[in-house]
Amino acid sequence: MPVAPASPRPPRRLAGWLGLLARIVVTVGLMAWAIVGGGVGRQQDGEPRGVEWGRFYELLSQADWPWWLAALAVTLAGQVVAGIRWAALARPLGFDFPNRFFVRRFFEGMFFSLCLPSSIGGDFVKAVRIGSSTQLRLLAGCSVLADRLTGLAALGVLVGTALIARNNELGTAATCGVFAGLLVAGLAAFWVALAVLDRAHAALPEGSTAREFVARVLPYRQRPSLVLLAVGWSFVVQLAGVAAVVLVARALGVVQPPLVWLSVVPLVALAMVLPISLGGFGVRENALEYLLRGYGVPSEAGVAIGLLWGVCTLLAGLVGGVLFLLERQPLAVPDPSEPAAA
């Protein structure tokens, strides 16, 4: 019998592999640029700036590793708190699981973020893992989006406060005033968005699928304390991230005022959201080197801090990978609107 020709690889799958290959190339290129090239903005006043290999190796070889272990512990604790924050936002939408369930899924999302573009690549996996149907996965996606937005709100308030206070040399009272003002502005933005959601629900036809879906998200509007609680947890998560970087820097003998770290680390976290590298690697190291150089930190120290911070993130993600391998099936909520399989 004649052998049937092999079917060509689906174009979408090929595009996915090409996209992954491109991101791997970009990640390797950015890491090489950070280590070999020495980061961004290589030259100023005719003098080259970059990593001095002898000092770079000396920094890493003489690192005070107990401080780095403390940074790893803070990183893991921050992800646990982030999982609890997600639980607070997902339960009102019908995902009635204990905190440990969401913490586990959050770590799994961290693992996939190591393999997917940017630092938010695992968000899609988190939504899929807790929903058993298309509608429930959309709802889960709403909870993940709300979780991400509350985190960005806290991050924006912190970096805005730090930058304004540092650039204007504000005292403690004035800094607290700036923080309160930015926090109120952020919460007001959430209130406006939820009010728009409420109006959209009222405008949709009775009995429509879209109206029923929006109704599932209305608890955020009906219980404003949910957003307040999530934003509060977000400040804990963001401060844990800053503390982890401070501890990594301390391990390398780099000490800066708190306002420096509060302004630099959130900006680096925002840069890592860009979908140009795997897990934010390369972006993290270049951004830290560039920003810290403005505060007198040598290039090799900035890159080394980024590398050791990245290792903390990598190990936290690998914890999620182990959890994923131990349990492959999602513990998802059955959708009552869909008939059970025979």
Region spans (language model):
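Transmembrane helix-loop junction
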Residues: 91, 114, 132, 250-251, ...
